[in-house]
UniProtKB/Swiss-Prot annotation:
Job of this protein: Involved in peroxisomal proliferation. Promotes peroxisomal duplication, aggregation or elongation without fission.
GO BP field: circadian rhythm; peroxisome fission; peroxisome organization; regulation of peroxisome size
Gene that encodes it: PEX11E
UniProt subcellular location: Peroxisome membrane
UniProt keyword list: Membrane, Peroxisome, Peroxisome biogenesis, Transmembrane, Transmembrane helix
Up-regulation conditions: Up-regulated during sensecence. Down-regulated in seedlings by transition from dark to light.
Name of the protein in its database record: Peroxisomal membrane protein 11E
Expression (tissue specificity): Expressed in leaves and developing siliques.
Entry membrane topology: Multi-pass membrane protein
Similarity annotation: Belongs to the peroxin-11 family.
Extra information: Can complement the yeast pex11 null mutant.
Length: 231
């Protein structure tokens, strides 16, 4: 391939990536938490960017609760242990509730819904739902990693480490490990936003962890590169 062809291919991937509403949301999330880290909770330009970006992001999430509600009522893969099923459904229910309540919070903070006290209350409830969903996600990923590890050990004993199925399981294990790291860090972000441990998890710590998980989310949404044809 020529340099021009490679450039076109790279630009096509960028366009594909930026066409995803979820990707744009996560880029804005990185800006939001990066600003929170810079402001350290103190008034100024960085804090203004943090608050404005947070409000703008809520528009990306309008009706997004339908996705997790669909996951809640969808059947699970056969052979999934009951504890993992319950944790997965709990995650879907909590995340769907968070996203639904977040719409009301957006209405309140944009001035459409006038009850400020109820808006703040629903905002805290929604964050607790997100905290709970992050805990459930971490537990699910730990359980699934255990299942993958057991399956891979059996394959290693059968001397099939070079098998395509083994490599696919290894990639899946890596993906779940990254998801576990992200969800564990999101727990800290949620605790910081709720100010449950203000002495330990300051706005700057919350911003640092939020910025990191945003970058992880951006990475997870990257489109796979097409295989290049060799001459």
């Amino acid at each position: 391939m020529t340099t021009l062809d490679l450039t076109r291919a790279e630009l096509a991937l960028i366009v594909l990536y930026l066409n995803k509403a979820e990707a744009r949301d996560k880029i804005c999330r990185a800006i939001q938490y990066g600003s929170k880290f810079l402001s350290g909770g103190q008034p100024g330009t960085a804090q203004t960017v943090d608050k404005n970006t947070s409000l703008a992001r809520k528009v990306f999430r309008l009706f997004k609760f339908v996705n997790d509600f669909h996951g809640l009522i969808s059947p699970v893969p056969k052979g999934t242990p009951l504890p993992l099923v319950l944790l997965g459904k709990s995650k879907n229910a909590l995340l769907s509730t968070f996203l639904f309540l977040d719409q009301i919070v957006w209405l309140g903070r944009s001035g459409i819904y006038k009850n400020k006290e109820r808006t703040e209350l629903l905002g805290r409830i929604s964050l607790f739902c997100w905290l709970g969903s992050s805990v459930c996600t971490s537990a699910v990923e730990i359980g699934e990693l255990g299942r993958l590890s057991s399956s891979m050990k059996k394959m290693e004993k059968e001397l099939k480490a070079d098998d395509e199925l083994y490599r696919a399981k290894l990639q899946k294990s890596n993906d779940r490990t990254l998801a576990l790291i992200k969800s564990s860090m999101d727990i800290i972000v949620a605790i910081g936003l709720l100010q449950l441990a203000p002495k330990t998890i300051s706005p700057r710590v919350t911003g640092a962890f939020g910025f990191t998980t945003s970058l992880i989310s951006c990475y997870q949404l990257l489109p796979s590169r097409p295989k290049l044809k060799t001459p």
